[in-house]
A protein has these predicted regions:
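Glycine-rich phosphate-binding loops of nucleotide-dependent enzymes
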Residues: 2-191
């Protein structure tokens, strides 16, 4: 069974059919590319797969579960993470806190546990810090963990966005032009 099965997917904005009758099957453990000219609808497809846009036709099935039209939070919890063409970080938050945002969809403690900062909250926060630092180290961002995200150079901001997406522990990772705007050295470092 495919990890992701897309059938007859489409979306129209008013009278403009942006994507029509897209069929796609993605197997677990493989690398795929969605290639096309500017304006072909690649980002629109990513937006439908992640719940940013609701398709006007078709189905999206992830790991046997229909996720068509679900909101982005539920789709993220189901196992799809993404990056964006234009970097979308929390610029005034620290680098480590940006990664921890991705970890929060896996952490389970009640509202009162968090408000009162009970031992379970402190334990989970410590665990998230450890996991976030592991990811930052992989992307050579661990030394900048306490910087504001906006203080990082562009190439490192790209890496941070990928680290945050990976923090969700996705089944499927969608990278929307991950090297856009990067110089050749930054691109090579990313690969």
């Amino acid at each position: 069974m495919a990890l992701l099965e897309v059938s007859n997917l489409g979306i129209a904005f008013g009278g403009l059919q942006a994507v029509a009758q897209l069929d796609l099957s993605i197997e677990k453990g493989h690398l795929y590319g969605l290639i096309g000219p500017n304006g072909a609808g690649k980002t629109t497809v990513f937006n439908m797969l992640t719940g940013v846009y609701k398709p006007t036709e078709g189905n999206i099935v992830l790991d046997g579960k229909d996720i068509t039209g679900q909101n982005p939070e539920l789709i993220s919890k189901s196992g799809i993470a993404r990056t964006f063409q234009n970097i979308r970080l929390f610029n005034e938050m620290s680098v480590i806190d940006n990664v921890k945002v991705g970890l929060h969809n896996q952490i389970k403690y009640g509202m009162w546990t968090g408000i009162l900062r009970l031992p379970a909250f402190k334990e989970k926060e410590h665990e998230m810090n450890r996991e976030a630092m592991k990811l930052l180290k992989i992307f050579d961002l661990d030394k900048e963990a306490n910087y504001k995200a906006s203080q990082l150079p562009y190439g490192k901001q790209r890496k941070l966005e990928i680290a945050r997406a990976l923090a969700t522990n996705p089944k499927l990772l969608l990278l929307d032009e991950p090297a856009a705007g990067m110089n050749p050295n930054e691109t090579e470092e990313l690969m």
